[in-house]
Amino acid sequence: MTETMLLDPVQVLVASNQPLQVGSAALFEGDRLIALGEDARERAAEQGVAGQNRAHQLLAPCLVDPHSSLPNPFTGGGETLETLINAAGRAGYGQLALLPNSESERDSPERLKGFQPRDCDLKVHLWGSFSYRGEGERLSSHADLLEAGAIGLSAGQQIPSASLIDRALLLGEMAGAPVLIAP
């Protein structure tokens, strides 16, 4: 059976453009937030769930790091994918996106595999490489990368030539995906 828990009162930040809700309530079923505020209180009362006072705690959306760099994700002498995920989770991040510049430039669909750890609440997204091997000379297969799960394409630290960018736009394989190009 799934555990139901009511945090009441608790401080709730729904979004950055909304004020902090002091004295609000949050209802959870298992690991899912199912209701906030009066709706949470009403649902909890229907189920006979008592509130737990968390007035000094803050419930807020997880942070997102849209462009993490991890040169050696699996064999790094410093940070690895595992240590990055652990540190990000402790710091309040719920999602991160890895740039493609690594020991194996993510310029083909098969290089997008193995990055989502099991038994982990943190979601790992991957940027695909804009060019083959990240060298800025030949385009990678944008459509294949996006179909394989890349959230967008990144040119890395270099600025691709105008002709390469023009060719990518003419091919139209990027659809509506975001493209990161260094300033």
Segments predicted by a language model, with ranges:
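Divalent-metal coordination cores built from histidine and acidic residues
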Residues: 85-183
